[in-house]
Regions:
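Alpha-helical structural signal
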Residues: 16, 29, 45-46
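A short tyrosine-centered beta-strand micro-motif
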Residues: 36-39
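Periplasmic/extracellular, small/polar-rich flexible segments of pilin-like filament-forming proteins
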Residues: 63-161
Length: 161
């Protein structure tokens, strides 16, 4: 009988070893899946920001050329935005652009992202006062401007304070 036992060698993995491997894979998946979901939401929101860049260009040109302010939703860029993730685009009288999000994730659908024209580092432009003087830049994603999207979903280029 002893001879029979000594000739049997272990081949393959034991049940305990397999269970440890399954547990490790489960832990890694629990960490990786939520991180990947956040990444995909940010990637899709980047498309929303790119869709708004047409309005940003149009409004910048109008500010530089001067003339009379066009008014809310009359900046001639609101209807040209084509994206499956943008439900609609609106502008206010000063050129602040807002996009309503759709088709991404229930946690961000129907939320709003804003782009705000600035005349200095932190001062929003006023069409009545700053027309013809050009713009300093744009602020993206600030809650003070109407963005109601959780900041962790915003692309890094759109986390304006």
């Amino acid at each position: 009988m002893k001879k029979l036992r000594s000739s049997m060698t272990q081949r393959g993995f034991t049940l305990v070893e397999l269970m440890v491997v399954v547990a490790i894979i489960g832990i890694l998946a629990a960490i990786a899946v939520p991180a990947y979901q956040d990444y995909t939401v940010r990637a899709k929101l980047s498309e929303v920001i790119i869709a708004l860049s047409a309005c940003r260009t149009t409004i910048t040109e109008i500010y530089q050329s001067g003339g009379s302010p066009p008014g809310a939703n009359n900046w001639q860029c609101e209807s040209g935005v084509l994206s499956s993730y943008v439900a609609g685009v609106t502008t206010d009288p000063d050129g602040r652009v807002s996009a309503t999000i759709q088709g991404i994730n229930p946690s961000v659908n129907d939320k709003v992202v804003t782009l705000t024209p600035l005349i200095s580092d932190s001062t929003p432009a006023s069409a009545a006062l700053n027309m013809g003087s050009g713009l300093y830049g744009w602020r993206c994603g600030a809650a003070a401007d109407g963005t109601n999207l959780p900041p962790q979903y915003l692309p890094s280029s759109c986390r304006g304070g």
